[in-house]
Amino acid sequence: MARLKEIYRNEIAPKLKEELKLSNVMEVPRVTKITLNMGLGEAIGDKKVIEHAVADLEKITGQKPVVTFARKSIAGFKVREGWPIGVKVTLRREKMYEFLDRLLAISLPRVRDFRGLNAKSFDGRGNYSMGVKEQIIFPEIDYDKIDALRGLDITLTTTARSDDEGRALLRAFKFPFRN
């Protein structure tokens, strides 16, 4: 079992149940999935960009990403319907907890000028989104082998009913919020 999953079951869930005054263990908020998305506008001019992004996300997550395509043409962005414009991965269960553990323990401390995560990046329903400016903060990515620095979006979907519940859950996981 993943280290963070065990910590959640044995320490975080009972503490949150008491803190949020919940009557049932199933009411305790938990992380259901983590979605990583890489929007690649530069893929319009160069098709190799998609291959490099797929390889990077696969190294980071240990799971093969899905290529996303434009739903409709937008002349202003020089995009045609059906063109590949990004890659995404959805992590659940064990892989999700393993990734979360690596993100908190290894990757976030490697961010340059890191002052903590914004505690206001919740969506109103307890889900948290954050952006990473460069993929080299992950130890799986070899700096010498990358073609360009690319950012990615990380979204944590939780069963929390409000932002306060979601914030309490992520604080229990020791998320480094700055405010």
Curated annotation (Swiss-Prot):
Keywords per UniProt: Ribonucleoprotein, Ribosomal protein, RNA-binding, rRNA-binding, tRNA-binding
InterPro entries in UniProt: Ribosomal_uL5, Ribosomal_uL5_bac-type, Ribosomal_uL5_C, Ribosomal_uL5_CS, Ribosomal_uL5_dom_sf, Ribosomal_uL5_N
Gene Ontology biological process terms from the UniProt entry: translation
Gene Ontology CC terms, in alphabetical order: ribonucleoprotein complex; ribosome
Pfam family, one: Ribosomal_L5_C
Highest taxon above the source species: Bacteria
One Gene Ontology molecular-function label: rRNA binding
NCBIfam families: PRK00010.1
Record text on subunit structure and interactions: Part of the 50S ribosomal subunit; part of the 5S rRNA/L5/L18/L25 subcomplex. Contacts the 5S rRNA and the P site tRNA. Forms a bridge to the 30S subunit in the 70S ribosome.
Similarity comment text for this entry: Belongs to the universal ribosomal protein uL5 family.
Function: This is one of the proteins that bind and probably mediate the attachment of the 5S RNA into the large ribosomal subunit, where it forms part of the central protuberance. In the 70S ribosome it contacts protein S13 of the 30S subunit (bridge B1b), connecting the 2 subunits; this bridge is implicated in subunit movement. Contacts the P site tRNA; the 5S rRNA and some of its associated proteins might help stabilize positioning of ribosome-bound tRNAs.
Name the UniProt record assigns to this protein: Large ribosomal subunit protein uL5
Lineage: Bacteria, Pseudomonadati, Pseudomonadota, Gammaproteobacteria, Pseudomonadales
Encoding gene (name): rplE
